[in-house]
């Protein structure tokens, strides 16, 4: 059976696992209808528009 010859260092193990530890930050862009910051590719929470079309009717 194969056995590792040397103990892997902390930096090597942590470098390998670092891809799973990255935080995903949502991307924001300005809404084309109201100018509010909204998450990309999502309906604007303030006005209910996405790509110049109204998808939600919000009572303001």
UniProtKB/Swiss-Prot annotation:
Source organism of the structure: Borrelia duttonii (strain Ly)
Molecular function as annotated in GO: structural constituent of ribosome
Tell me the GO BP annotations in alphabetical order.
Answer: translation
Protein name in the entry = Large ribosomal subunit protein bL32
GO cellular component terms, A-Z? large ribosomal subunit
Do you know which InterPro entries this protein is assigned to?
Ribosomal_bL32 (IPR002677), Ribosomal_bL32_bact (IPR044957), Ribosomal_zn-bd (IPR011332)
- The UniProt transmembrane annotation reads none
Q: Which family does it belong to?
A: Belongs to the bacterial ribosomal protein bL32 family.
- Write out the entry's keywords from A to Z: Ribonucleoprotein, Ribosomal protein
The superkingdom listed in its UniProt entry is Bacteria
